[in-house]
Amino acid sequence: MTRRISLTQYLVEEQRERGRIPAQLRLLLEVVARACKSIAISVNKGALGGVLGSAGSENVQGEVQKKLDIIANEVLIEANEWGGALAAMASEEMDSIYVVPNRYPQGEYLLLFDPLDGSSNIDVNVSIGTIFSVLKKQSDTPGVSTQDFLQPGSAQVAAGYCVYGPQTTLVLTVGDGVAMFTLDREQGSWVLTTDEVRIPEDTREFAVNMSNQRHWAPPMQRYIDECLQGKDGPRGKDFNMRWVASMVADVHRILCRGGVFMYPWDKREPAKAGKLRLMYEANPMGFIVEQAGGAATNGKQRVLDLQPSQLHERVSVILGSKNEVERASAYHREAG
């Protein structure tokens, strides 16, 4: 049975007993968790807080920003800029990196985040979330640039997400497995509710936007066609489809009971490797999924091995239960 300990105690034990995290990283993760609590409050207020609807602007991706996108982005920046652990931050909602102002001490860590994933679901009261990734600045040179962020996902020192749903749940890895914390609203604290999260190697569930099927590459078409044939087809078992249109919600379900999440290449935008962003969506989720015993690829390569060339780089994603990810990836490799 999982010990009901606080996030602070969990992180202190990771630091003290296992030597997994330095003190500055522990403090950084606690600040990110506090910021997620603040975002949860804004999400829960909804129409009463005047936070629903469009902000009338676009982000660097050309996507219309919701009011909560901007609020969540500001909360994360303001919470983290002054603590002394960070050198800079990067976000889906910002064109370029945000360097910690000179009036605050600069640390050695880099924080990347999607402040509010699944924001198309905000106005209809469906689960959304925050995704974050932590890297360590590799160079000893003064200052920080975009180049410092361009590290493969395997270099992450921590990653997590917070899902704002019926419960507010924080999922975290520091490279020593995956733990889930539930927000106790009466106490205002994060409480460990699941440790040693494991994703089953086999599954009968897949998550993908089937309305785009005609635009996918043949290997992805083949994989889905076989799933849809069920027990009468080559797979010999029936599958169920799930799709929330929020990566956080779909991946959280996979962590809880297995499944495979796919956001494949689309021939309507052939020059783009995929839809999801590598640095602050695919990498942190890939790290979490691998730490829980799953797998994450772009169809041909392990996501965490990809070397980014730009901050907002996009990528195809197949992640979740190991055997299904391997099958879908094998079809891509066979196709060349």
From Swiss-Prot:
Q: Which domain of life is it from?
A: Bacteria
EC number(s) on file: 3.1.3.11
Report the cofactors. Answer: Mg(2+)
Annotated GO biological processes are: fructose 1,6-bisphosphate metabolic process; fructose 6-phosphate metabolic process; fructose metabolic process; gluconeogenesis; reductive pentose-phosphate cycle; sucrose biosynthetic process
Q: Which residues bind Mg(2+) 1?
A: E92, D114, L116
Q: Cofactor stoichiometry and binding?
A: Binds 2 magnesium ions per subunit.
Give me the residues that bind Mg(2+) 2, please: D114, D117, E281
* Gene3D superfamilies the UniProt entry points to: 3.40.190.80, Fructose-1,6-Bisphosphatase, subunit A, domain 1 (3.30.540.10)
Q: Where in the cell is it found?
A: Cytoplasm
A Pfam match: FBPase_C
User: Which keywords accompany this UniProt record?
Assistant: Calvin cycle, Carbohydrate metabolism, Cytoplasm, Hydrolase, Magnesium, Metal-binding
Catalyzed reactions per annotation = beta-D-fructose 1,6-bisphosphate + H2O = beta-D-fructose 6-phosphate + phosphate
Q: Which CDD domains does the entry mention?
A: FBPase (cd00354)
State any GO CC term: cytosol
The annotated pathway is: Carbohydrate biosynthesis; Calvin cycle
Q: What class of enzyme is it?
A: hydrolase
- Binding residues annotated for substrate, in chain numbering: D117, G118, S119, S120, N209, K275
GO molecular-function term, one example from the UniProt record: fructose 1,6-bisphosphate 1-phosphatase activity
Q: Which NCBIfam families match?
A: PRK09293.1-1 (NF006778), PRK09293.1-3 (NF006779), PRK09293.1-4 (NF006780)
- Indicate the family of this protein: Belongs to the FBPase class 1 family.
Cross-referenced HAMAP family = FBPase_class1
Q: Describe its partners and assembly state.
A: Homotetramer.
By what name is this protein known? Fructose-1,6-bisphosphatase class 1 2
